[in-house]
């Protein structure tokens, strides 16, 4: 028997079904992928995309819009691009790239996107911040007048670094650039300065070794390691310094002090050159794109010392009366000591000074291999501790005179007494500037060594016994005048009483002959 349906029932059922459907209008800007090659995607149809915007691709993959052309967009993929195909849907997100920030990152190793890669579980960070940010304006900045101690006598005495300064570390490969920066990070233990170490284009084994050394020396607890290793894409190597800078700025904005090491910006420039050439941007000098100067200047200008007003405004009054700082130690690798190449000259002109490390000095056993003649700190002098500033003036003069006379003495057979004394003093100063790796020196010990050589107490000590003498002298003062050593380390002051104590202590130690 056929079933009969009442037309009114059918219409009621249809009405009920239509009313139950929840429709929402969503405006979405979509395009389609036209090509994928070498980490670069070309997308057709994204009319409203912004420069630097995140573009969503299938399989939870994102790309960064870099080239906005008349009818297509050139974007660089952040992560794996093997699964992308021509015709895939690309969507705009309306967001720019952000990374996690906060104290939760201290002691962790993350990639350029802020994702943990150390196997210690999730970060637990609750805040994020954009990787690109405009540097603090002139009105919000304060002059650099507080020191960052690296623990190296040669640097702290002759090329002092201040909080908020940008000091370039430049030299050929295998001259101790990373060692100097890592020792500076280790020396911040107990000072309250938070550190960020950005490894760009390095071997994964090298990064693992650095992390292990930081852990062994108790420095990982105050350090964030951002790693974009050689096996990662050019996009990750390009982004990583900006991500690390954002993590450091978190502390600066809240009235704290931070130190960031970019190791090294030469590899970032190479990664950016690769991206630019793949995006068909016109090449310039050494095939770098025209904006390679801006690549580094916008990064390094974010390192600053900001005023109390800036911190108060940023924290909405939660933090008052405190200045913040971000000190940058960018590293540049030169080829055969050529500091006049494109990227080195760019970074030299952006920074507030440079520490030049030389292969010949390194091979001669003078480590750190600092060339005191062409190394300079343009603003750090105002930040030097009183005691080091007072004592270190003679060091530079002794070394400059020694270099001049040493060249002359090669041709002269008979030297007068004054010249011979200057040569011997210069030899001792050069020897005294040597220092072992992972052994940063306190302010008091540095001052003691410099005072001893300046006042001629080392003139009768054989050059090959100098470092043993220095070690014994430091131990003698730690045992007999521990209170004075602690006072100098905490205040950095200098007066006649301290000078008298130094004089008496050194003379006492010399009589023991225990070196």
Swiss-Prot record:
Alphabetized PROSITE patterns for the sequence: ATPASE_ALPHA_BETA
Pfam families for the chain: ATP-synt_ab (PF00006), ATP-synt_ab_C (PF00306), ATP-synt_ab_N (PF02874)
EC number: 7.1.2.2
Chief place of localization: membrane
Subunit relationships: F-type ATPases have 2 components, CF(1) - the catalytic core - and CF(0) - the membrane proton channel. CF(1) has five subunits: alpha(3), beta(3), gamma(1), delta(1), epsilon(1). CF(0) has three main subunits: a(1), b(2) and c(9-12). The alpha and beta chains form an alternating ring which encloses part of the gamma chain. CF(1) is attached to CF(0) by a central stalk formed by the gamma and epsilon chains, while a peripheral stalk is formed by the delta and b chains.
Subcellular location: Cell inner membrane
Binding locations of ATP: 171-178
Presence of the UniProt keyword Cell inner membrane in the record: yes
PANTHER family per UniProt: ATP SYNTHASE SUBUNIT ALPHA, MITOCHONDRIAL
Known catalytic reactions: ATP + H2O + 4 H(+)(in) = ADP + phosphate + 5 H(+)(out)
Its job: Produces ATP from ADP in the presence of a proton gradient across the membrane. The alpha chain is a regulatory subunit.
Record site feature (Required for activity), residues: 375
Matching SUPFAM superfamilies: C-terminal domain of alpha and beta subunits of F1 ATP synthase, N-terminal domain of alpha and beta subunits of F1 ATP synthase, P-loop containing nucleoside triphosphate hydrolases
GO cellular component: plasma membrane; proton-transporting ATP synthase complex
Membrane topology type: Peripheral membrane protein
Keywords assigned: ATP synthesis, ATP-binding, Cell inner membrane, Cell membrane, CF(1), Hydrogen ion transport, Ion transport, Membrane, Nucleotide-binding, Translocase, Transport
MF-aspect GO terms: ADP binding; ATP binding; proton-transporting ATP synthase activity, rotational mechanism
Alphabetized Gene3D superfamilies for the sequence: 2.40.30.20, ATP synthase alpha/beta chain, C-terminal domain, P-loop containing nucleotide triphosphate hydrolases
Cleaved signal peptide residues: none
Top enzyme category: translocase
Gene source species: Xanthomonas euvesicatoria pv. vesicatoria (strain 85-10) (Xanthomonas campestris pv. vesicatoria)
Protein name: ATP synthase subunit alpha
Gene that produces this protein: atpA
Statement: the UniProt record of this protein carries the keyword Cell wall biogenesis/degradation: no
UniProt superkingdom: Bacteria
Family classification: Belongs to the ATPase alpha/beta chains family.
